[in-house]
Design a protein with these regions (language model features):
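Cysteine/selenocysteine-centered motifs that mediate thiol-based redox chemistry or coordinate metal-sulfur cofactors
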Residues: 305-318
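N-terminal chloroplast transit peptides
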Residues: 1-28, 32-40
């Protein structure tokens, strides 16, 4: 992740307007002359106190967690589900009829082979029943053996994940009302920006509708390839994926949704563990605030001790 790349690049350090007489005009300086001589060791962000008790929380609520593959409670086998040794990515999905869970699951499936080749385990916990978990895995292609489910939000509370809009109100609102308000951006930071971004696309992001991808929508992708080109996130591309997900979710709503409607707005997060120590921790701020799978992958693939300070100069030039 932290490999050094180029050798030199043109750099203009003068902020003044240059004139023909300026002896400094158009000069270049090797980037490596700075980066090879200066090293700034920056400490990594200290994990939240509750994440340092990750294993304790998992064990305390292990009887509420059921493996989707066989429907059995984790109980005393929680160490087998989330290994104590090695590198492990743990996804805390929202409820299984949620946009976030579907998008993240589809993207992660694309990377599972890469994780396995690098001896990195992937596990997920989601809100719902075992039957909902089976339906979710069938439709997103997320492996059943890597997913456990719970119908309680206690574990999510222990990890201090946002319970969603309206939790502190004196009046208990119906879960669907809270969900609609959050979809409109109320009590859900960043949601509207992310939704709008899905319509505009970005030249700086990779496409999501790619042949062979788990998130592909072939009919739309082929049309976009012909009319808008390839190799970047095209306008309406993310919106197309979200529309496809929404259609499938609504068509199978009764199979997927939690009985407790208050779980409709419960947010989740993600961890990366190294020998049972959390060194990466993400909390969803709102709807569509799930962890960027590429960022998750970068942290999971860090070489050496992930707790060691990193070279800020080297990272700056990545």
């Amino acid at each position: 992740m932290f490999s050094s790349k180029s050798t030199t690049r043109p750099t203009n350090y003068s902020l003044r307007k240059q004139t023909p007489n300026s002896k400094r005009a158009n000069k270049t300086r090797p980037r490596s002359s700075l980066s090879s001589q200066v090293s700034i060791k920056a400490p990594r962000r200290k994990p939240r106190e509750t994440t340092e008790r990750f294993r304790e929380h998992i064990e305390n609520f292990s009887r509420d967690l059921r493996r989707v593959s066989d429907g059995e409670s984790l109980g005393e086998t929680s160490d087998d589900f989330v290994p104590k040794k090695g590198r492990v990515v743990v996804l805390m999905f929202t409820q299984l009829a949620d946009f976030d869970s579907w998008e993240l699951a589809k993207f992660i499936v694309n990377d599972i082979d890469l994780y396995e080749r690098n001896n990195i385990e992937v596990r997920a916990i989601g809100l719902g029943t075992v039957e909902a978990g089976k339906s979710f895995c069938k439709r997103t292609r997320f492996p059943q053996e890597k997913l456990a489910v719970t119908e309680e939000q206690d574990l999510y509370r222990m990890f201090e994940y946002s319970p969603g809009f309206g939790d502190a109100l004196p009046v208990k609102l119906p879960g669907m009302v809270k969900l609609l308000l959050m979809c409109a951006g109320i009590g859900s930071p960043g949601t509207l920006k992310t939704v709008v971004g899905g319509y505009f696309g970005s030249k700086n992001k990779k496409p999501v509708l790619v042949e062979g991808s788990n998130a592909d929508v072939p009919e739309v992708r082929k049309l976009m390839d012909l009319t808008l080109g390839k190799d970047y996130l095209r306008p309406f591309e993310m919106a197309t994926l979200r529309l496809a997900n929404m259609t499938e979710i609504l068509n199978n709503w009764d199979e997927l949704v939690c009985k407790n409607d208050q779980l409709l707005v419960q947010r989740g997060g993600a961890f990366v563990l190294d020998d049972d120590r959390v060194f990466f921790d993400h909390r969803d701020a709102g709807i569509l605030g799930y962890c960027d799978p590429n960022r998750l992958k970068e942290f999971a693939m860090i070489d050496g001790d992930p707790k060691e300070p990193f070279d800020a100069i080297e990272i700056m030039h990545e």
